[in-house]
From Swiss-Prot:
Alphabetical keyword list: Cytoplasm, Glycosyltransferase, Membrane, Transferase
Any one GO biological process: sucrose metabolic process
Gene name of the record: SUS7
Keyword Cytoplasm belongs to the record: yes
Enzyme Commission code: 2.4.1.13
Protein name listed in UniProt: Sucrose synthase 7
Organs and tissues of expression: Predominantly expressed in roots, flowers and immature seeds.
Catalysed reaction equations from the record: an NDP-alpha-D-glucose + D-fructose = a ribonucleoside 5'-diphosphate + sucrose + H(+)
InterPro entries linked: Glyco_trans_1, Sucrose_synth_GT-B1, Sucrose_synthase_pln/cyn, SUS_EPBD, SUS_N
Membrane topology field: Peripheral membrane protein
Length: 855
């Protein structure tokens, strides 16, 4: 096959393609004439291949050409712009590696072009005036990263932490003076003004090495469990402060680790040392849109897996922080704040409570800060994530003041979530000079095809002009980016990843991104989350099963009557159940699954279908996409006459009961299906597999990495519903013939989870990132400052104007409420009077200033 051909990175397509064209000149002339015959247009990969095959009459010649080098190039082309007589190709030979060429259809001459030139070529299809304007806005973030080291191998993408450790080892190795940046960094470590690890008496690398040697010899002579307090005074005599460990043995390990780094740094010791550095105590996490809460929120608009992810993340990170702080020998109380929006019209949730403890944690809270209308009142109602942009800058200012008050100082790490949370995290990290991590969860640009070049058509509804601009700002501002899978960053051999789609793109009439984000940037890291195993455990663990919930679940699945909670019924309860649970929107593709089922008679004969998704009545929803999908669901149930075979249950918010629901589906020997058009990760896939359910999941995105196809589950192509339906039906037919096959797949799925997906691994990795990147960014401070200034300009001249143009939903209603927000509708945390230090007063004053636009 053409896709199996080798291609050396050093080879240039512009150099090698002319010879290949000459060897098949007659056939390729016909092919290119066919490409240009229909005038200017954009051709996707499948269209390119179809046109190539149609232009070749001889089957043997066809196969020879398709299997050869030219076939390989066209197979690797993601899209081509046709502007007769030219055809410009965007060729992606490997993940993250792009080359652009244009071919003259008459003489088959080939010319290499830059990403910017290709984008101008493409813009001509949509806005020729903009494309030809020499002064059209072009942004090139890559030009500001020229001295930043980058990974080079596609297989290494996402291993940023490992790469950074290697590079730091190389840069700091050699002469003792090269270690000065590390010494300077260690001298900055403190907790509320109290020095950690070393004090100012150690002002040279040689003094540090001497102190380490003396201390290591000393603790080597002590019983290994001797508490730090027993020898704290001796350490201080050598210029060493607390933070090395809680026992003599732990101190010895940390001392030795740093000594090894200073003597001959290597990546392993470098990463190990920074995992022990006491630099992170207080963390702020932003998740702004939707209804963020701990109960009665799942299934509400813009509220789904991200909420579950963050709550589990917080519990895991607090547990890891507490363990680290204890092992560091410190008596410090860590704090984690999840910043979200306070919504006065809370719809029966606690989203109107200002400060709420996170369940099953000691020191973590949800802090809710309201959006403000233009006249300063609290915005009462929910706002779609697509309409949120006019509120974010002021929200960042108000959040900053609250954070500094509650934490009594700056946080040590800020993590953003989704576009809105990442933008606000960028604003605050720049304002407070704090290390920033970002998590996309989903990048809308990849969900909607051609949403960049066709942004005008979608902007009134989705405001992608704001969203894509905000995404580019936060990606480039962030110190590190957390992803759940490789595919999220760089996709697969055939298809670019979410982030890779932002490498070079254009929004004609708005902005051209000659370089947006480079997936070889060492800021990219993969940290796969897990599932809460106290809730999601195998159906075979009978002693833990929540049998008290079985009557409720039985009614939910099998009662015959339509209610406000469910419609449809299952006439034959002896059939296995295929089950799906997700938000009811286009991308989650629940209606697609219903259509697959409705079209496949064999599948309908073998199994029942149960879906948990959204609301059942369109009149009860305010979400545009959900309303469309609700109506589509009703139409599909009528069209395929599914009553008796389908149960549609409205969104369920009780995670504990949902865990038992998964297990009850497993009791029927059923399966879980995740049919999304694209899924960045797939928490429900992890949950289902944790419960022992054989799982079918989309091959578009993260689930393709979670599941080993045919072993621990199955991949389905959401674009080909008939094929997906056949694959699911074949599985159940095989299980009917061989019942042990179901158990085999179930067991393999559980094994996959236990080997790869736990929250403990996740929390350890993310905290290591926070510590390591805090030092890493000091090594290229000047370049980083230059890029921040560039980003500040871009924020001010581009994003701010775009955000102002978005209508402020609900402002008129808020103005009509003359008394503002009724006190009974917002639960405010008790006021605490604290004496403020001079530094706290300064920080509080800073909080009142406008954020200097971090990105």
């Amino acid at each position: 096959m053409a896709s199996k051909l080798s291609f050396k990175r050093m080879d240039s397509i512009a150099e090698t393609m002319p010879d290949a064209l000459r060897q098949s000149r007659y056939q390729m002339k016909r092919c290119f004439q066919r490409y240009v015959s229909k005038g200017k247009r954009l051709l996707k990969n499948q269209q390119l291949m179809e046109e190539l095959e149609k232009s070749l009459d001889d089957k043997v010649e066809n196969e020879k050409l398709v299997e050869g080098f030219l076939g390989y190039i066209i197979c690797s082309t993601q899209e081509a712009v046709v502007l007769p007589p030219f055809v410009a190709f965007a060729v992606r030979m490997n993940p993250g590696i792009w080359e652009y060429v244009k071919v003259h259809s008459d003489d088959l001459s080939v010319e290499g072009i830059t990403p910017s030139e290709y984008l101008k070529f493409k813009e001509t299809l949509y806005d020729e005036k903009w494309a030809k304007d020499d002064n059209s806005l072009e942004v090139d973030f890559g030009a500001l990263d020229l001295s930043t080291p980058h990974l080079t191998l596609p297989s290494s993408i996402g291993n940023g932490l490992q790469f950074v450790s290697k590079f730091m080892s190389s840069k700091l190795g050699g002469k003792p003076e090269s270690m000065k940046p590390l010494l300077d960094y260690l001298l900055t470590l403190n907790y509320r003004g109290e020095k950690l690890m070393i004090n100012d008496t150690i002002d040279t690398v040689s003094k540090l090495q001497t102190a380490l040697l003396l201390a290591e010899v000393f603790v080597s002579g002590l019983p290994k469990y001797t508490p730090y307090l027993k020898f704290e005074q001796r350490f201080q005599e050598w210029g060493l402060e607390k933070g090395w460990g809680d026992t003599a043995e732990r101190c010895k390990e940390t001392l030795n680790c740093l000594s090894e780094v200073l003597q001959a740094p290597d990546p392993t010791n470098m990463e190990k040392f920074f995992s022990r550095v006491p630099s992170i105590f207080n963390i702020v996490i932003f998740s702004i849109h939707g209804y963020f809460g701990q109960e009665k929120v799942l299934g509400l608009p813009d509220t789904g897996g991200q909420v579950v992810y963050i709550l589990d993340q917080v519990r895991a990170m607090e547990e890891e922080l507490l363990q680290r702080i204890k092992q560091q020998g410190l008596h410090v109380t860590p704090k984690i704040l999840v910043l979200t929006r306070l919504i006065p019209d809370a719809k029966g949730t606690k989203c109107n409570v200002e400060l709420e403890p996170v369940e099953n944690t000691k020191y973590s809270h949800i802090l809710r800060v309201p959006f403000k209308t233009e006249d300063g009142k609290d915005l009462r109602q929910w706002v779609s994530r697509f309409d949120i942009y006019p509120y974010l800058e002021r929200y960042a200012q108000n959040s900053c003041a609250k954070i500094l008050d509650i934490l009594e100082g700056k946080p040590d790490l800020i993590i953003g979530n989704y576009t809105d949370g990442n933008l606000v995290a960028s604003l605050l990290s720049n304002k407070l000079c704090v290390t920033q991590g970002t998590i996309a969860h989903a990048l809308e640009k990849t969900k909607y095809e051609d949403s960049d070049v066709k942004w005008r058509e979608m902007d009134q509804k989705y405001h992608f002009s704001c969203q894509f601009t905000a995404d580019m700002i936060s990606m480039n501002t962030s110190d590190f980016i957390i992803t759940s899978t490789y595919q999220e960053i760089a996709g697969s051999k055939e298809k670019p990843g979410q982030y890779e789609h932002h490498y070079a793109f254009t929004m004609p009439g708005l902005c051209r991104y000659a370089t947006g984000i480079n997936v070889f940037d060492p800021k990219f890291n993969i940290a796969a989350p897990g599932a809460d195993q106290s809730i999601y455990f195998p159906f075979t663990q009978k002693q833990k099963r929540l049998t008290d919930l079985h009557p409720q679940i039985d009614e939910l699945l099998y009662s015959k009557d339509d209610t406000d909670e469910h419609i449809g019924y299952l006439a034959d309860r002896n059939k296995p159940i295929i089950f799906s649970m997700a938000r009811l929107d286009k991308v989650k593709n629940i209606t697609g699954l219903v259509e697959w089922y409705g079209q496949n008679k064999k599948l309908r004969d073998l199994v029942n279908l149960v879906v948990v998704a959204g609301l059942l009545d369109a009149s009860q929803s305010k979400d545009r996409e959900e309303i469309e999908e609700i109506n589509k669901m009703h139409n599909l149930m009528d069209r395929y006459q599914l009553k008796g075979q389908i149960r549609w249950i409205k969104a369920q918010t009780d995670r504990v009961r949902n865990g038992e629901l998964y297990r009850c589906i497993a009791d029927t020997k059923g399966a879980f299906v995740q049919p999304a058009l694209y899924e960045a990760f797939g928490l429900t896939v992890i949950e289902a597999m944790n419960c022992g359910l054989p799982t079918f999941a989309t091959n578009q995105g993260g689930p393709a990495e979670i599941i080993i196809d045919g072993v621990s589950g199955f991949h389905v192509n959401p674009i080909n519903g008939r094929e997906a339906g056949i694959k699911i039906a074949d599985f159940f037919q095989k299980c009917k013939e061989d019942p042990s096959y179901w158990n085999k797949v179930s067991t393999a799925g559980l094994q996959r989870i236990y080997e790869c997906y736990t929250w403990k691994i996740y929390a350890t990795r993310v905290l290591n990132m926070g510590s390591t990147y805090s030092f890493w960014k000091t090594l290229n401070k000047e370049e980083r400052q230059a890029k921040q200034r560039y980003l500040q300009i871009f924020y001010n001249v581009q994003y701010r104007n775009l955000a102002k143009a978005v209508a402020r939903a609900g402002d008129q209603q808020a103005r009509q409420t003359t008394t503002g927000v009724a006190p009974s509708e917002i639960v405010v945390r008790p006021k605490e009077r604290k004496p403020q230090t001079r530094m706290q007063r300064i920080l509080t004053r800073l909080a009142g200033q406008k954020p200097p636009v971090s990105e």
